C-alpha cells in the first residue's frame, strides 16, 4: 500500500511540474514576462526567410518545440524560425535539451529583412551557442572555445567554469540585453558579458567568420531566432521580459561604488603596453586600480597616464623586503601614484614552514612600517592574507596572532577572499570577528571541486569568474559593507581575464 501511495504521489508531482511548463507564474506576470511558446502551437513564430511557419523540420509535441533531425546540415530542412516582433532591451529565458552530438543556437538582434541566401544557411545574428561540446566537432573549432555551449558563437567563449548539464537533461539559457551591454547565463550562472559596438567587440568581429558583414551585431533592434542545424534539440518555457534601458553607472544594491581591479590581473599586458592596457581596463568600466608593480615606469608616469583617462590608483602593493629596507621609496611611490594605502601580500618563509618566529618578526616590521607611513606620509599600511597564516597556533591561528599583536593605529588589513576560503576559513566569520581592521578587499572566486590547504598557492586556472565558483560572494560583500571596507578590487590570476573580468564586474553589479 505504501508503495502504491508513493507511486501515485510521484505521478501527481510529475504532472504538477509538467503542468507548470510553458506557463507564467503570478510573479512573472506581475514582472512583465510574456510567453513566446504556449506548448501547443507555433503562434508568434515564422520561418526566417519565409512568411509562415515551416511546414517541415519543426514539431510541437508533448509541450515541447523540437528541431527534427536531418543529418546535421544547417537550415536544409525546415530552416530557422524567428519571432514576429523586434526586441532591444530584454531578458530572454529558454529551456533547452540536447541530444547526443547535437548543434543548435539561440540568436538575437536578427534583422528580419536580411536578404534570402542563395544557398541554405542560418540567418545572421548574435548567437548563444547550443551544443554538445563533447561530441560535436564545432566545439574544437573557432578560437579558445568560442563555439562551445553558451558562448557568443565565434566571438567570445563562455567562462570555463560554466555549469552545463549532461546531455538529455534540461538546461536554462538566459540572454540579458541592456543597451549595448549583453550577458549570457547558463543554469542561473552568468557565463559571459560584453558590450556590443565597443572597440573590443569590433576587433573580435574583424577576426571572425562575420568579418565581411557590415555592421554585424550592431542593430538597435532585432528578432529572436531558434536555429535548425539538422540535429534533434528540444525547447520549452520560452519567455521574454522587455525592459527599460538602465544606464550602466550602477554599482549594485550592495556596493556603493563600482569596484576596482588589481593590476596583477592584467600583469602581462601592462608589462607589454601600459597605456593600451589602461584603455582596455577603462573600456570594461573599471577606473580604480590597485597597482602591485610599476611595470618599468616611474610612479609619476603612471599617475599621468591614469589622470589622462579619468582613472585612479587607490592602493600600492609592494614587497615585504621593501617596507623593511626601502620604506621612504615605497611611500614616495605611493604618494606619486595618488594612493592612500600601501599593501604587502606575502611574508617570506620557507615553503610549508610558517612559524611563530616568522609571525613575530612580521608583526614587528608591520608596526614599524605602518607608523612611518602614517605619521610621515599620511598613508595606511595593510597586510594581505595568503592562506598560510591560518595554520593553527595555540587557541587560534597565526593570523589571529598577527591581528592581536599589530597596532590598529598603524596596521590595517586587506582581505583576499579566495585566500581566506582556500585554507578552510569562512570569510564572513572573519569579517564579523575583525570588522573595522579591514580596509581593502580582493574579490575572487575558487573553482568548484578544488580542495584547499595552507600552502598559499593554487593553479591559476582555479581563479574563476565571480559567481561561478565555490564562494558565496554576495554574503561576503554584505558582511564587508558592515565592516567598512573602503575599496574592493577584482583580482583574477587566470589566463582568461578578458573573458572573466567582465563577468565578475557584471556579477557584482547585480548584487
Model features per residue range: what roles?
Residues 1-22:
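Bacterial Sec-dependent N-terminal signal peptides
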Residues 20-257, 307:
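Carbohydrate-interacting regions of secretory-pathway proteins
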Residues 246-341:
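N-terminal pre-domain/capping segments
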Residues 257-262, 289-291, 313-318, 342-344, ...:
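Hydrophobic faces of well-ordered beta-strands that scaffold small-molecule active sites
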Residues 261, 281, 289, 306, ...:
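Conserved, mostly hydrophobic/aromatic
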Residues 266-272, 288-300, 318-326, 350-353, ...:
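Acidic-and-aromatic substrate-binding clefts and catalytic sites of carbohydrate-active enzymes
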Residues 288, 320-413, 498:
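Active-site acidic/histidine proton-transfer and metal-coordination neighborhood
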Residues 375-470:
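Acidic/histidine-rich catalytic cores of soluble enzymes
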Amino acid at each position: 500500500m505504501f508503495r502504491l501511495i508513493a507511486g501515485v504521489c510521484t505521478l501527481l508531482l510529475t504532472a504538477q511540474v509538467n503542468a507548470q511548463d510553458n506557463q507564467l507564474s503570478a510573479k512573472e506576470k506581475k514582472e512583465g514576462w510574456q510567453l513566446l511558446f504556449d506548448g501547443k502551437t507555433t503562434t508568434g513564430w515564422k520561418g526566417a526567410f519565409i512568411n509562415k511557419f515551416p511546414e517541415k523540420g519543426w514539431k510541437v509535441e508533448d509541450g515541447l518545440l523540437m528541431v527534427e533531425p536531418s543529418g546535421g546540415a544547417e537550415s536544409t530542412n525546415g530552416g530557422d524560425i524567428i519571432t514576429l516582433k523586434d526586441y532591444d532591451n530584454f531578458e530572454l529565458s529558454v529551456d533547452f535539451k540536447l541530444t547526443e552530438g547535437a548543434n543548435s543556437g539561440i540568436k538575437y538582434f536578427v534583422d528580419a529583412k536580411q536578404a534570402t541566401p542563395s544557398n541554405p544557411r542560418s540567418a545572421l545574428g548574435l548567437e548563444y551557442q547550443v551544443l554538445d561540446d563533447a561530441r560535436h566537432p564545432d566545439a574544437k573549432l573557432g578560437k579558445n572555445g568560442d563555439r562551445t555551449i553558451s558562448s557568443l558563437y565565434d566571438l567570445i567563449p563562455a567562462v570555463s567554469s560554466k555549469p552545463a548539464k549532461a546531455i538529455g537533461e534540461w538546461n536554462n539559457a538566459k540572454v540579458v540585453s541592456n543597451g549595448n551591454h549583453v550577458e549570457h547565463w547558463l543554469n542561473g550562472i552568468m557565463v559571459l558579458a560584453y558590450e556590443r559596438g565597443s572597440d573590443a567587440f569590433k576587433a573580435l568581429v574583424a577576426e571572425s567568420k562575420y568579418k565581411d558583414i557590415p555592421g554585424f551585431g550592431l542593430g538597435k533592434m532585432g528578432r529572436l531566432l531558434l536555429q535548425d542545424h539538422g540535429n534533434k534539440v528540444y525547447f520549452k518555457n520560452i519567455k521574454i521580459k522587455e525592459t527599460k534601458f538602465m544606464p550602466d553607472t550602477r554599482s549594485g544594491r550592495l556596493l556603493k561604488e563600482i569596484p576596482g581591479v588589481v593590476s596583477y590581473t592584467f600583469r602581462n599586458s601592462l608589462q607589454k603596453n601600459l597605456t593600451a592596457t589602461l584603455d582596455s581596463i577603462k573600456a570594461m568600466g573599471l577606473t580604480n586600480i590597485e597597482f602591485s608593480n610599476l611595470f618599468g615606469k616611474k610612479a609619476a608616469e603612471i599617475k599621468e597616464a591614469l589622470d589622462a583617462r579619468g582613472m585612479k590608483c587607490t592602493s600600492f602593493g609592494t614587497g615585504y623586503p621593501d617596507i623593511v629596507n626601502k620604506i621612504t621609496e615605497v611611500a614616495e611611490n605611493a604618494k606619486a601614484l595618488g594612493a592612500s594605502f600601501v599593501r604587502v601580500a606575502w611574508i617570506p618563509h620557507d615553503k610549508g614552514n610558517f612559524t611563530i618566529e616568522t609571525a613575530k618578526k612580521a608583526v614587528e616590521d608591520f608596526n614599524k612600517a605602518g607608523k612611518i607611513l602614517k605619521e610621515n606620509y599620511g598613508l595606511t599600511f595593510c597586510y594581505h592574507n595568503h592562506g598560510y597564516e591560518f595554520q593553527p597556533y595555540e587557541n587560534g591561528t597565526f593570523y589571529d596572532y598577527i591581528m592581536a599583536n599589530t597596532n590598529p593605529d598603524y596596521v590595517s588589513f586587506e582581505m583576499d577572499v579566495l585566500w581566506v576560503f582556500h585554507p578552510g576559513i569562512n570569510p564572513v566569520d572573519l569579517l564579523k570577528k575583525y570588522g573595522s581592521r579591514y580596509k581593502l578587499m580582493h574579490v575572487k572566486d575558487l573553482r568548484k571541486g578544488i580542495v584547499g590547504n595552507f600552502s598559499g598557492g593554487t593553479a591559476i586556472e582555479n581563479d574563476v569568474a565571480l559567481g561561478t565558483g565555490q564562494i558565496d560572494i554576495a554574503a561576503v560583500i554584505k558582511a564587508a559593507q558592515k565592516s567598512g571596507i573602503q575599496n574592493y578590487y577584482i583580482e583574477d590570476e587566470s589566463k582568461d581575464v578578458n573573458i572573466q573580468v567582465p563577468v565578475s564586474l557584471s556579477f557584482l553589479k547585480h548584487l
